[in-house]
C-alpha cells in the first residue's frame, strides 16, 4: 500500500519523540478537550501488570516517593513500546477514552498521594482522625481503580491475540521489546535528510525595549486609554517584519514536522519487524539498492510465454485433457478448441506474471514512507512512461479480475457448474474484491434466494472498487491497439462470442452444426433459471437485478475497450427513455478527471498482454441470451387454440412486457458493442435469431390484438372504453415497432385493418339489428292477431331501433376517432411525380439552396433538406426516422415548422436518371442514423418524390411552399399519404370502408322506412296508425341524427380524391333527409322545431367544395329543395295543419307535434331570439307589422329559382310583399325574418365528444364546373340560408332625435366614468366599517357525528344529524392549539362571511360549537357532490344555462353584501338532490371595507386557484389590486368546465405555467360547441380589462341565462 505509512502519521500537534516523552516530567492536566498523545494513547497489558505487581507486592520495601517515580516512568515508556498498537476501531476508541480519563485524574491523585505520604513528617494537627479516614478512603478507591484497570488489560490482551495477524509471526507470547533510542538530529541512512541538510534555526529577534517615559504625571484613565489604543492598532495591522518571521517559523516547523513523521514511520517499521531502529535503517538502505533494477524490469516487462507449450500439451484447462474434451464434443475442430484453450492459458500466464510484477512494485513502494520520497530519490519512477506503464498494468489486472469474477457469479446464478465446458473464458484467480461479500454461496436451485442474495452482495461489490490507491478508476475511451497478431488470433477464432450459432466452444462459425447441436437448444441451459425467475419475480424485476449486478463491470470494461473517442452521432443509439421504468441506460460522457487518466494501449501492445474483450463479449451475450430464452419461453407458451376473452388481456400484457424487455436488452447489447467492435453492423448480424424471435412475438401480439377487438365487438355494449383501449395499444406499438425489423409497416397496416374492421362491424351490427327487429315483429304477429299485441310489438321495436341507432352511433364515433388518429400519425408525406428532366429539378434545388443528405451505404437514396437544416443534424435524423416510420411527434414539439425532407430512390430502372442524380456537385451532409432506420430506408419502395415532415399538421404548409418553389417541374399525386407504401394502401382501404359505412347507414334508414310504411301499416288498425306513426318518426329522426353526425365526422378523415367521393355522399344524404321532411313531417308554426336542429346544422356544414363539384342542374335542384324544406319546416304561425296530419284526431294519445327523439335535449321549449338579441314584444308596432323589404331576399333567390307552390297548402316560400305582410295576423316576426334568424344561428357542432379536433386543410379544386359558377352558387346558397334582415328599424323624426340625444348623453357619461371623473348614484349608504359586528352564532340543538366525507385545507368534514329534527347537515371540524389566534381569526372571518346571508344558492350556515382545541362549524349538506364531478364528461347546453344562472345569482348576492369569494371553481360549487346549485367554501373570501365602492382595486392579496384566476389577480393590476370582477372571470372558467368537462388550461400541469399564460394576456379558449349566446356570455366574463368586464347584475340580464328554473 502506497499511502499506508502516510495514513499512520499523527497530526503535527502530537509529533513528540519518545525520548522527549521519557525525559520530560508528567504533563499538567490538559485543558478540555485534551488531545491524547499518540505515544501514550493506551496502557498496554504488560505495563499494567508490572504496575500491579510493583504497587502491591513491593509496597513494604519501597518508599512511597520512589514508588511513585517508578510508576510514572514505567507508564510513559511502556505506553510507547510495551505492546502492539490498537488494531480495531472499537479498541482504539476504548483506549483513547481510558487514556483521557487517566490523564484527567492522574495528576490530582499523585498530588493527594504525596500530601498523604508526607503527612507523618509534619507536626501533629488537630483533625488527625479525619486524615486517617481520608487515607483509608483513598486506598479503597485506588484498589478499585487497579481492579478495573486489570480487567481492561485482560480484555485488551484477548483482542490483541485475535489481531495478531498484523504482527510478524513470533512464537510464544509477545516479548517485551527494548525501548529504542531515537534522536531527531541523528542521521539515518534510510531517511531523506541528514544533519548536513538540517536547516539552521532562525534566532528570534530580540525586541527593542520601548522608550521609558515617566507616567507619574499622567492620570490613570489616560494611561488606560493609551494602552487600549495601542492594542487595537496592533491587532488591526501586521508589519512586514512580523510576516517574514512567521514564514520563517512555518518553514522551520514544516521541516521538523516531516522529520518527525519520517522518524515515527521508521520506528513503526522497526517495531513491526522486530528490529532495532539502527538495524531497520540499515535493512531499508540495503533493500533500496535493488530499486533501479526493479524499475528497469517494469519498464522492459513483457509477458513470457516460454512455458506455454508445455502447459498446453500437458493438460487442458481445469485439469481436463484435450483428448477428453474432444471426445465430449464430437465433431469439434481441434483448431477451435486449441484456440480457446490457448487464450485461457495466455490469460493465466499473463495474469501470474503481471501479478508478480505488481507485487514487486508494491515491495519497493513499501520501502519509503511516501511516494514523494520515492520519486525524489528515483526520477525514473516519477517519469511519465513509467507511470503510464504502471497504470496500464493496473487497468488490465483489475478489469481481468473483475470480469472473471462476474462470469463466475453469473454461472452460479444461472446454475451452470462447468463454465469452461460451455466456452466461458474463466480461470482460477483470487477474487478482485473481499470474498466476504462478493462470492455468495448459493444453495440448491432456488432462483429467488439466489437473486436476493445476489442483490445484497451486488450492492457491496458494486460500491467497492478495486482497492489500489495508485491508479484512479479508468473510464476514458482509449485507442485500443492490441498486438495485431494476438487480436487476429482471437477475433478470427472467437466467433462464438459474437454469434448465437455456437454455444459450446470458440471455434469457427459452423462449429455448432458440426458438433451436432440443434439450434433449438442453444440457450436451453438458461431455461430452468428463466422459467423459475419469470414465475417468481417477472421479467421486469429480473432485468433490474441482472442490470444491477453486471452494469458496473461492463461499463468499466467498455470504456477501456473503445477504440476512439469520437462523439457519437445523434440517435445513432436508440433513446432508452421509453424503457425508464425498467432500467435507464447510462450514457453519461466521461468526466474531466476520467479523461485525464487516459491509458495508452501501446503499453499493452508492448507488453504482449492478451485482451479481456472475450470475457466482456461473453458477459454481454449472456444477458442477451437470458432475455432471448424468455422470448422463446413465451412463444412456446402460446395457447394452441383461440384464447378466451377472460385470458386474452393477461396474454397481451405478457407480450408487451417481453417485447419491451427484449428491446431494452437489445439496445443495451448494441450500446455496449457499438464502439468496441470495428464493424457497427457486426452485432446486428449476430443477433438474427433474436431479431427473428422478437418479430415472431410482435406478430403474436398483433394476433392477440385483432382477436381481442373482435371479441369486444361481439359484446352488446362494445362502444364502452373501446377507443381508449385502441389508443393505449397504438401508443405502445408506435414506441416499439421502430426497433423491430419490418415492424413499422406491419403495425400501421394492422391498426388500419382494425379500424376498418370496426367500421365494417358497425355496419353489420346495424343490419343484423334491423333483421332481428323485423323477425321479432313477424314472430309476434303470427302468435297473436290482437291489435293491442301488435301495437305493443311495434312500440317495442321502435324503442329497440332507437337503442340500435344509439349504439351504432357510439361505435362509429369511436371507430372514426381512432381512424382519424391513425391518419394524423401516419399521413406525414406528400407524393409528387417528376414532370421535367432530373437536371432541371437539381438546378432549381441548387438555386433554392437545398442541401443533399447522404447516408453511408444508401447511395441510391437521394435526400434533400432546406439549407436552414444544414447544421441541424439532429433534426435531419429525426426526419429520417419519421420517413422510416418512427413516431417523432413527441420529439418535434420545439422543431421549426419548415423542417421537411425530400426523398426519392432512383434504383436501376433508368441509367440516365441515375447519372443525372449524380451530377450534384455541392458537399453533402453525412449522417449516420440508427441501424433500424437504415434497414427500413434500404427496403423502402419509393417510385416518385416524397416530401416528408414530422407532424401531419405541418404538411399542408410545407407542400404549398414547395409547390410554389418548383412550379411546373413536379405534379402532385397524393396531397397526403404515408411514406410507407404498405401503410398508404391500408389507409386507402380504411377510407373506402368509411365510405361504405355511409351507404350502409343510408340503406338502414331506408329499411326502417320500408318496415314501418309497407310492412307494419298492413298489420295495424287505422285507429292505432297515428300512435304508431309517432314512434316511426322517432326512430327515423334517431337514424338521421346518427347519419348526420357520421357524415360530418367522416369528412375530416378524407383527403385527396376521397373528399370528392364523400362530398357526393354528403349531398345525397342531405337530399334524402329533405325529401323525408317534405313528405313525412308536418309544416312548422313559425318557429324552428327542435328535431330539425341537427338537420339544419348538417345543411350548413356542407362545404363549398362539395357544391362547386355539382353540375348546374343538380345545384339548381338542390337549392330549390333546400328552399322548400326550410320553408316547410319553419312554416307560418298558426298555419293550418297540412300534409299527413290532416287525419289526426284531437284525442290522439300523444301531442300533435313531432316528439323529441333520443338524441334531443330534454328541454322541450326552445326560445329562438331575434338577431338583435331582444324580445319581439319590445319592438315598436311598426317594426312588428312591417317585414324586411322583400326585394333583397327575392332578388337573391329569383336569380336561380322561380317560385313554386309548396306541396301542402300552396303557400309560397318566397318572401311576401309588404302589403301581404300586413295581412298576416299574429305574426311577431315575418316568415323570412324568422328563417334568417334561424339560419344565422346554425353552425357546425359535432355531436361526438370522442372525436379529435378538426385539422386545418386546404380544399382541393375539382375539375367539374367552372370557378365563377362555383363561387356564385356558394354565395347564393349561403345567402339563402344565412340571410338576415336589416336591423335598422324605421323611426319617426321625434323619436329619432330623442334616441340620438339619449345615446350621446350615455356615451358622454360612460367616458367620464371611465376616466374616473364622475361616479354613480348608489341606493346603499356609505359604510366604512371594517368588520361586521355580529357575534358567532352558537348551536342550540343536539347533534350526532356521522361518516367522514372530505378533508380540506382547514379541516375535515363529516356528516352530522340533528337529533331534534333529524335533519342531515355537514360538520366542518377545525383543530387548533389553545392559543393559536391565527387559526381562530381565519375561522372567525369565514364565519362572519357566512352570517347574515341566507339564499337558496348559497350554502347555509347553522352555527358553531367552540371547544378548547377544536371548533365545529355546522353547514348545509349537499348530497349530490360537486359540479366538478358532475361535469367531467361535459353537460348539455340547457343544463349549463340553468347552472350558470344559479351561480350568477349566488355571486350577485355575495357582491351585493360586499363579499368577494375569490375561489369560485367547480369543486366549490355543490349540487343538491332538488337540482339547486349552491356556492360554498368561503375560506378564501374577503369582506370589502366599503360596499358602495365601485373601483376595481378593492383587494390586494392573492388567493384562489390558478386555473380560475383573473389576470388582475395574477399581475396585481400594477399595484391597484382586484375586486369583485375577479369572481366574474372565475364564473366564465366554470362555464368552460361545464362545457368541456375539463378545467381551463388543463393542458398545463403546473400553476406557474397557467399564471404566466394568463398574466401575458391570454384567455381560455371558448368551446366551439357552445351556442353563439354562450360564446357571447363568455366573452363578457373573460374580458381582460376588469373595468370592461360585466358585473353579476349585468350578466343576469344576458339571454344566455334567461331560462326557467322550474323546468324539468
Curated annotation (Swiss-Prot):
Residues 24-37 have a biased composition (Pro residues). Residues 1343-1601 form the Protein kinase domain. Residues 1217-1230 have a biased composition (Polar residues). Residues 91-101 have a biased composition (Basic residues). It is found in: Cytoplasm, Perinuclear region. Residues 1252-1261 have a biased composition (Basic and acidic residues). Changing residue 1372 to R: Loss of activity. Residues 1-23 have a biased composition (Low complexity). This is Mitogen-activated protein kinase kinase kinase 4. It comes from Homo sapiens.
